[in-house]
Amino acid sequence: MCGFQDYFLGDHLAEAHDMSLDAYLESFPKAATVAQEVLDSLAERSKGIQRSHPPVPTELYTELLGFKVRVNADVDPLACLPMPHEYRFPSHGDLAVDLQEAAVSFLRGRHLYIHGMPGSGKDAFVHAMSALLRRPAIIKTVTPTTDVEAWLYVRSFDQEGTRWETQELFRALTEGYTCPNSKRVLPYIILISDFDRATKSQAEFLRLIIDSISGRVQGPGGKVFSVVPGTQIIVTANTSGGGDVRGRMVSANVIDGSIMDRFERKIQFHWMEWDDEEPICKAKFPILFERCPDSFRQVGKSTTSLRSSIAKDELYAEFSHRAVCSWLGHMEDIVVLTKEVPKDLVKRGARTWLDGMPDEETRLAAQKLIDAYVKSGVIGTERDSSGDRKGPLAEGF
């Protein structure tokens, strides 16, 4: 068209002629747009390269916690539990060991009782395993007033009269999950959260389901149905079945020993080490990390100090991952609303947890544990020259 030569004409056509490659080829269908030298070079570099089809979906495997495990690619993700936000498997401390043993039980399909302090990641572990491995699962939460029978079936009526209608849990136990494409039938994972809040009668519904000989479930009218082989019952709780022993989980009940005995594995979860928790927190609160990165070091040292004291029964409190997120979350809320980072930012964030202490004595003990790690300190309140309390509005919040 103009005699210009280059390895590729696309840029020249756009800059000099305001024309796209498609428009150029419409006018000159047989014209070359890439130099033959370039085509020859690409052909030479691609010699010996073999293309292969992706693996068959039913034969997908992955490495997880040191184990080679199968991924059910033909299971709809919506049939699995959702992946927790920014979840990562820990690699330090007691919790890393706890998860390793829990993973063995999970992967082998054992009925599992997981207990531990609030915020130690009990439910999150099951959610992550279900989501990553495409294991169909449903979750139920126990409260003292829950009608667990309604999880299985309910009485219904219409113009033709009354009848029993089976519910999601009953169908999961007796029918399993049918993969939409392959039509394979897979057993469900049934996650029951806060199981130690169950009353004696509520807990009884699991007795037949986790029977060591053959799982069964009682249907309407007393008829007994077989549970799909491989169905896995996992429950989470704050206590190990003996009720509240610390005075902090007052709604926890004692669980019948024969029911506890039917759980094939019992695993205790501990709190996460800060080395594992820090990258999760930075991912959850990116604005705070961008504007005040040193705050994570202060909160991290405070976290380690508090949890050590709680583990020794020196502090009558809990400091879970939820508490850490509450602290950091309030700090991020502040930096989002302010142009300059307040000097007492970490202290103000700590208040959202400290104000939840059961009494002044416990609050002061917690303040003393973290005061040395927070630059502005957390004990006492600054006052201006008039003696009035100096709050955030005085700093132009």
Predicted segment positions?
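DNA-binding alpha-helical recognition surfaces that contact promoter or target DNA
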Residues: 11-15, 128, 326
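Active-site catalytic microenvironments for nucleophilic, acid-base chemistry
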Residues: 16, 132, 212, 330-334
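Short, surface-exposed acidic
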Residues: 21-26, 33-36, 288-299
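Short, basic alpha-helical nucleic acid-contact segments in DNA-binding proteins
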Residues: 28-49
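AAA+ P-loop NTPase catalytic core and its hallmark functional loops
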Residues: 49-294
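Alpha-helical lid/collar subdomain of P-loop NTPases
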Residues: 51-92, 100, 273-278, 282-397
